[in-house]
From Swiss-Prot:
Catalysed reactions, as listed in the record: 2-(N(omega)-L-arginino)succinate = fumarate + L-arginine
Sequence similarity: Belongs to the lyase 1 family. Argininosuccinate lyase subfamily.
Organism (species): Staphylococcus haemolyticus (strain JCSC1435)
GO cellular component, as recorded: cytosol
Pathway: Amino-acid biosynthesis; L-arginine biosynthesis; L-arginine from L-ornithine and carbamoyl phosphate: step 3/3
Gene Ontology BP annotations: arginine biosynthetic process via ornithine; L-arginine biosynthetic process
EC number: 4.3.2.1
HAMAP family in UniProt: Arg_succ_lyase
SUPFAM superfamilies with a match to the protein in the record: L-aspartase-like
Cytoplasm recorded as keyword: yes
GO molecular function: argininosuccinate lyase activity
Domain of life, source organism: Bacteria
Keywords: Amino-acid biosynthesis, Arginine biosynthesis, Cytoplasm, Lyase
Protein name: Argininosuccinate lyase
Amino acid sequence: MSSKAWGGRFQQQPEDWVDEFNASIDFDQTLLDEDVQGSIAHATMLANQNIISQDDKDAIINGLKEIQQDFHNGKLAFKKSLEDIHLNIEHELIQRVGDAGGKLHTGRSRNDQVATDLHLYVKKEVLEIQDLIRSFQTSILKLAQSHVDTIMPGYTHLQRAQPISFAHHVMTYFWMLERDYSRFVDSMKRIDISPLGAAALSGTTHPIDRHETQQLLEFSSVYENSLDAVSDRDYIIETLHNISLTMIHLSRFAEEIIFWSTDEAKFITLSDAFSTGSSIMPQKKNPDMAELIRGKVGRATGHLMSMLVTLKGLPLAYNKDLQEDKEGLFDSVRTIKGSLRIFEGMLDTMTVNTDRLNETVHQDFSNATELADYLVAKDVPFRKAHEIVGKIVFECIQQGIYLLDVPLERYKELNSNIDQDVYDYLKPENCLSRRKSYGSTGQDAVRHQLKVAEKLLNND
């Protein structure tokens, strides 16, 4: 008798190196818990439909639970000749409970079996990712609440542009993550569907009840089309996309953390616990965790591209190409979960150097727009005001001074509308307090923003 579950019509066994190429057990053993969960539901339904006996069902379920326990205790050895987690479990089950184990696959194919495992896995992991995003958002909000009045330079083109609230800046990432969170939540409608019972592609002649297994596995609905059930990998692509976009947002934040921690900026100080040193330069303190998060976005987006290319030319229904849907998915899930945990810890333990930030906004021209707005308030056309301020900035650069250092006499030479009150107008803290528009960096607007964010988290 052939050692293969499908070996009946074959006269030759594959060589070991062919088995090595064909096998997926090295990575799809990740799905053992989901495979056992799906098989227990399937066996329960088979017994309830009088397709197998209650005794056989009990033997199957007890055997599956023993296999699961042995796996987690490191007592289970898998065989590559058995290809994947599904056939390894089935083989082990038959060894333990005899013919009853051979009845488990009644009315089921590996095609709907693996699809069920993947739906269960993705559902579980997406829910955990949502929790991790919420936890990270809570850390961002807590940091922002402590720095509403902390002023920093805002940037465009990596050039200092306008003074902004540190809280306003970091809250930008809160809202990016909120969009990420909502995408994961919305994707659950396309993840939480049961393919079990679709069999290979056309359903089964056995009197199974697909809605019973749907309920046992706590899926919201079942696929309406058996071909679609076994061939659909849209939910994996969608999950990989959502992971990739979240990682891109984390990468952008990580880049800012890296810049802020440089000797040139010194805006923040990272905890030693989230930094490393150099093997040759003893003075170094490197932001390696932030750099790793920035670097890992490449593998996440790469896995998305790989899955898109894998799926693009596949005819219905199942093809072996779909074995390639797992490694990238598993790695992307590990990557985003690890990145979110690390980033939260890094944010919770870093120090914001408020004195340095305050010093910085008093030694730049980020208040130049304020001077232009000041002139506009004095009935100077904006384009004329823009030109006047540009000339003043050029003179300041030539003299090594800033706008607050320019004598009133010189201001009046440039435009007689400028009075003593210009100096209060140009102070960075006043630049912020005048920002009254909804969603702006003004302290009142930021405090309102924080209340909206806090309410959102509390009502989730």
